């Protein structure tokens, strides 16, 4: 009879709803890591702005200069780059004298982005574009053609840091880290670039000082605590 009663008690305990069963203590911790790498790709954006009395004249002038800029950039990058138009617009220009707004002409804007798989050509790309007629430099961005290896390295380091933090918490409680129950990436890995324009000498190519691309990762874990 006693054996039967004990078996029934064990069976009843095993069939209790999860919320009624004793909860095991857990520890939650997170870790972050940053891995630096030299960029191997640069995107240079340049703009061509033209103004004329009519929209057609502004567009035609812009098309002529933009064609010259594209031809010059193709000659520089060859098969080692890619060109595309990222923005194009034609807008009226108004006289600033109140009270009426009179159209005085039209302005056409064309933005070209060149992707180059050789970061040392960034300065030359700016020089070539402006010499061919580009009126402004819109932006300069360095990146990695294949960020995956650096991303995985950052994730591994962030995971190790999360585990180290969990062990420190457990030690402070006089316990140990047991089985890891959950491991989750804590957000997007964000590569960004430290880039500065250096001082230029007379007749020199536009100097670009390139910093490393930093890839950041964060990971959070939840693990059991054991005695």
Region spans (language model):
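Short, charge-dense linear interaction motifs
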Residues: 2-227
């Amino acid at each position: 009879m006693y054996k039967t009663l004990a078996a029934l008690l064990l069976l009843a305990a095993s069939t209790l709803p999860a919320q009624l069963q004793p909860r095991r203590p857990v520890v939650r911790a997170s870790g972050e890591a940053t891995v630096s790498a030299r960029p191997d790709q640069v995107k240079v954006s340049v703009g061509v702005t033209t103004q004329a009395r009519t929209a057609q004249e502004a567009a035609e002038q812009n098309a002529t200069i933009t064609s010259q800029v594209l031809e010059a950039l193709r000659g520089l990058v060859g098969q080692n780059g890619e060109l595309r138009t990222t923005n194009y617009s034609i807008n009226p220009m108004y006289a600033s004298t109140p009270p009426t707004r009179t159209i005085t002409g039209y302005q056409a804007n064309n933005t070209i982005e060149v992707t180059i798989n050789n970061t040392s050509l960034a300065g030359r790309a700016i020089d070539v574009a402006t010499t061919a007629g580009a009126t402004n430099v819109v932006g300069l961005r360095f990146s990695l053609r294949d960020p995956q290896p650096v991303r995985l390295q950052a994730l591994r380091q962030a995971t190790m840091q999360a585990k180290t933090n969990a062990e420190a918490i457990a030690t402070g409680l006089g316990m140990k880290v047991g089985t890891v129950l959950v491991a989750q990436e804590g957000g997007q890995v964000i590569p960004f670039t430290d880039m500065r324009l250096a001082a230029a000498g007379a007749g020199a190519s536009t100097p670009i000082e390139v910093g490393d691309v930093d890839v950041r990762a964060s990971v959070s874990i939840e693990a059991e605590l054991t005695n």
